[in-house]
């Protein structure tokens, strides 16, 4: 008799745990992240969209951000970003905030960007933001006129004023302010998500190695010609 009651208790506990897990799964937003590159050439716009699913309607009061790691092949111009933030076009934090925009790809380092998302008026559970990115100079290649820069899917971060999604979040090691909430760092949490695509590939135009000699000769001739024209003008019209 005691064994039967013990078995019933175990079954009841198992059902309770299962129902609790199902409740948590239903309460957690099924986040989906999409990345898209706009424009062509070296100067592009990275459009990031986060869809929180049906449970995302409870995200009111939360700040949503995308933590993006940019590889050495691309960068964000901090001066351009400051101008955009001044006009409330794009809001982001660069880590580190000092970026060498002149460095080539093989001398640059990864760049971490915390991109604050804005609610998408076309979707009640969606957030989106665009980040201007620029391709760096790459070494000349053999046989290919394009270098491939791989962008991994960003991490989704939440900064909430309430306890919504508390069971869905994990503390994230990010020191950045919750936009519009305070001026100091706040506690960010990462949200489990599924990327629409694991990675995004950016094609950057590069020169061909077999053209190196021709480029050097043309550059030297152009430099010599310009220097000669300048010296001629100085000697002819200069007052000594």
Please name every model-derived segment.
Residues 1, 194-240:
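C-terminal single-pass membrane-anchor helix
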Residues 5-25:
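Cleavable N-terminal signal peptides of Sec/SRP-targeted secreted and luminal proteins
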Residues 20-199:
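Non-cytosolic ectodomains/luminal loops of secretory-pathway membrane proteins
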Residues 1, 15-16, 171:
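Residue-level detector of intrinsically disordered, flexible termini
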């Amino acid at each position: 008799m005691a064994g039967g009651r013990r078995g019933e208790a175990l079954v009841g506990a198992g059902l309770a745990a299962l129902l609790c897990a199902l409740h948590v799964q239903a309460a957690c937003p099924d986040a989906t992240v999409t990345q898209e590159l706009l424009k062509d050439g070296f100067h592009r716009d990275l459009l990031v969209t986060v869809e929180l699913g049906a449970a995302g309607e409870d995200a009111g009061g939360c700040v949503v951000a995308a933590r993006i790691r940019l590889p050495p092949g691309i960068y964000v111009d901090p001066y351009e970003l400051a101008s955009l933030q001044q006009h409330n076009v794009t809001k982001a934090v660069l880590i580190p905030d000092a970026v060498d925009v002149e460095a080539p790809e093989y001398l640059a380092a990864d760049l971490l960007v915390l991109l604050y998302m804005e609610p998408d008026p076309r979707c009640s559970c969606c957030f989106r933001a665009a980040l201007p990115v620029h391709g760096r100079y790459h070494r000349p290649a053999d046989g290919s006129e394009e270098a491939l820069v791989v962008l991994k899917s960003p991490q989704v971060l939440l900064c909430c004023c309430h306890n919504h999604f508390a069971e869905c979040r994990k503390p994230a090691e990010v020191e950045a302010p919750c936009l519009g909430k305070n001026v100091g760092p706040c506690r960010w949490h990462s949200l489990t998500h599924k990327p629409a695509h694991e990675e995004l590939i950016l094609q950057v135009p590069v020169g061909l190695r077999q053209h190196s000699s021709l480029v050097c000769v043309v550059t030297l001739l152009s430099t010599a010609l310009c220097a000669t024209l300048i010296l001629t003008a100085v000697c002819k019209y200069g007052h000594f």
